[in-house]
């Protein structure tokens, strides 16, 4: 592998188009996103996530997102068996940050929409208008079955009908403070929420299937998708094109934000050695659990998030796109991501979050043309 990567050159018009948002996918579950005995082993804590998000804010990251996970994969690493809760975590992080956008994830089978509307309005107040909600339908049956709230396997084929009603109730309550919505899943009777958010509440999703993208095209402000492969930064382009086409049919602009893991070092070879080490320690027992759960949904197409997560190609980090290389190589590849039509941002994970974000801010981001608009750093990280 080459140590240094050539910089891409863009015209001014291209640079304007390629101003890309950067977010951090905070490790709300143990061990982050590496299912490996060779990866850093750690528990999720508020203090860890506080340090991560404050460091990300210092380096001008645009947003931070936490997932929700209610049951893990087990194995030697007890992968994702230990998780914080998304809304309460992000409420705490909203109180200790000042600029970065904050997103929590609602597991919509567990929380009535009127409660989510009120919690979101509360965190909007805490954050000064920096909060938004990521809506997920739920795919891992044991998460909900353990609590007695799994609605039955026909939910796999009706989940976006459910989510459509859910978001309509949210929009009613955030918009006017009142909802009388009547549907198959929800019935509101003069339901009230006040105070309302100080700014329009952003809703984000991660639809990969046709049904998921159609939902995002109608209701989401942007849509997450998986990057694909190792050091193939534009391989997600067909997914972004599908999202762009779906949004055009609704007359809305819904950009794609792409999930990548960054494994960087001084040289390409050093970064590659870390990646190979993580793969060699893959927790096969935990990965078997993931594969088993991905096969439970027999009613959805093969393009769903969980099917990609369980693909054996790079299951050690749930098959998110992986950028492995020197700081210059990673910067070049992220500029390539920004060149894909419809790609408006990336959501990043790291093998080691604290050092990864610092290296990104100090060594990678300054080389990225799609981040050249940022001001110079003027203060130390707390």
UniProtKB/Swiss-Prot annotation:
GO annotation terms (biological process): alkanesulfonate catabolic process; nitrogen utilization; uracil catabolic process
Swiss-Prot/TrEMBL induction comment: Up-regulated by the nitrogen regulatory protein C (NtrC also called GlnG) and repressed by RutR.
Reactions catalysed: uracil + FMNH2 + NADH + O2 = (Z)-3-ureidoacrylate + FMN + NAD(+) + H2O + H(+); thymine + FMNH2 + NADH + O2 = (Z)-2-methylureidoacrylate + FMN + NAD(+) + H2O + H(+)
Keywords: Flavoprotein, FMN, Monooxygenase, NADP, Oxidoreductase
E.C. code: 1.14.99.46
Classification via InterPro entries: Luciferase-like_dom (IPR011251), Luciferase-like_sf (IPR036661), Pyrimidine_monooxygenase_RutA (IPR019914), SsuD_RutA_monooxygenase (IPR050172)
Gene3D superfamilies associated with the record: Luciferase-like domain
Single GO MF annotation: uracil oxygenase activity
EC class (word): oxidoreductase
Name of one Pfam family that matches: Bac_luciferase
Binding site for FMN: 68-69, 134, 143, 159-160, 209
The protein's role, per its UniProt record: The FMN-N(5)-oxide reacts spontaneously with NADH to produce FMN. Requires the flavin reductase RutF to regenerate FMN in vivo.
Descriptive protein name: Pyrimidine monooxygenase RutA
Gene: rutA
